[in-house]
């Protein structure tokens, strides 16, 4: 309570509601104005309501499929068919949320997504970018760390906890988020026939995931870990959460080729020609039956109706990934050097050598940064301590570790820094 603004306390009153000082708990003074605690509380409520309205997800805010695709193009190189399929699936998912799952007595079912593609082809990046475009909470989980309840490992509810944490514990916001479950192929059944022994990290996890994929009110332990009776739970409805499952599914192309071969043999088709297709082209012919043969259970496949396939990235695509996206690695390194007033350049041969090394290591786009870190470590260690370097050129020989980067020096820069 503020005093000293006048001898007559009754003259002090709230400039907003007009209540006198002795009618309220607190009266805060500003230059020539006063506000009481009740008006402050009311203002906070109004601001909170407006913020909630801003955060409310509205169909008008959801970009159209073409717009989603255009934004994906800024971050993800290649994978044109995958970007198209994901744009449509995501748009339809959030349209379903906003219009209600039942329209004119027709129930609109949830369309979770399964992505198949080699390591480093962009599965995780696509899922992350979609969440960024839609401004919804996003969580990544690794299927290999999951086990069914009662066994050592993570419960499937821990996936939902990551989403709640990404939403700053705003449950309503989390219920419209996106969850990406990586390495989903690693929880495939070990054999096509059901086993007598318990498969706690394979079929058991698939069974545990069924409910949250379809839509249920899950009890999520707020501190993570295993459930125990005396713990309070967060209730999270998964009906409107979009689940994207991704995996490399190594060897599934053979199952597809076997199916295609059997199907076309009676028509004297050129089976050999089909078998010579690239793996990426073969994957595009995938059907749910191939996922079943790989080891996913029918109920699990049924809850992932949208199948998206990605191609292995070739040398040209990897070079484009290095230079074209908004957050391209070359642009990032150039910015690091720019902060030390050094211009960084990569020759075309150097970029191709980096791409070739990533292909050799079979790491796809994911391995590009590791290669660059290895090559650039020494020069990034030395340059900040030198005040005469103005330019650094990286050639093919540098990538092949045959030469050091070419450094251009200038006495003018050295003198300028010394005088500063």
UniProtKB/Swiss-Prot annotation:
Name used for this protein in its record: ATP-dependent Clp protease ATP-binding subunit ClpX
Similarity remark: Belongs to the ClpX chaperone family.
Coiled coil start-end: none
Gene3D superfamilies per the UniProt record, alphabetical: 1.10.8.60, ClpX chaperone, C4-type zinc finger domain, P-loop containing nucleotide triphosphate hydrolases
PANTHER family, sorted: ATP-DEPENDENT CLP PROTEASE ATP-BINDING SUBUNIT CLPX-LIKE, MITOCHONDRIAL, ATP-DEPENDENT CLP PROTEASE ATP-BINDING SUBUNIT CLPX-LIKE, MITOCHONDRIAL-RELATED
GO biological process annotation, one example: proteolysis involved in protein catabolic process
Keywords, sorted A to Z: ATP-binding, Chaperone, Metal-binding, Nucleotide-binding, Zinc
Species per Swiss-Prot/TrEMBL record: Heliobacterium modesticaldum (strain ATCC 51547 / Ice1)
InterPro entries: AAA+_ATPase, ATP-dep_Clp_protease_ClpX, ATPase_AAA_core, Clp_ATPase_C, Clp_protease_ATP-bd_su_ClpX, ClpX_bact, P-loop_NTPase, Znf_CppX_C4
Entry-linked SUPFAM superfamilies: Glucocorticoid receptor-like (DNA-binding domain) (SSF57716), P-loop containing nucleoside triphosphate hydrolases (SSF52540)
Domain ClpX-type ZB residue range list: 2-55
Task of the protein: ATP-dependent specificity component of the Clp protease. It directs the protease to specific substrates. Can perform chaperone functions in the absence of ClpP.
Binding-site residues for ATP, renumbered to this chain: 118-125
